Regions:
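Conserved, structured core segments of small domains
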Residues: 1-104
Length: 104
């Protein structure tokens, strides 16, 4: 099975403690539904910076900054996309970027 990096973008932060607990339960249920396909559940990420080839540093996160990541196993891109479609972030307008990890 191939490994896929899921990079989460966007979405909204739950405004209340109750909403945060509901969101965490949804993430837990989603990870649970994927079972052993979850290699590394990952984490949310903070503010991002970009170092450019000219040495300049952009500190605004860019147009679509990452909000988190996970490492998932799937047979192919279609299988990975099918798993990503269950991501709770999608319900709040976010997206999941998929990239196959190349073993070296």
């Amino acid at each position: 099975m191939a490994k896929y990096l899921f990079v989460y973008h966007g979405g909204s932060r739950p405004p209340t403690k109750e909403a945060q607990e509901k969101a965490m339960a949804a993430w837990g249920a989603w990870f649970g539904s994927m079972g052993k396909a979850v290699v590394n559940g990952g984490n949310p990420v903070g503010k991002s910076w970009t170092v450019k080839s000219d040495g300049s540093v952009v500190m605004d996160g860019g147009s679509n900054p990452a909000s988190g990541f996970s490492l998932i196993e799937a047979p192919d891109y279609n299988g990975a996309a099918a798993l990503a479609k269950g991501c709770p972030l999608l319900a709040s307008g976010g997206s999941v970027e998929l990239a196959q990890v190349i073993d070296m």
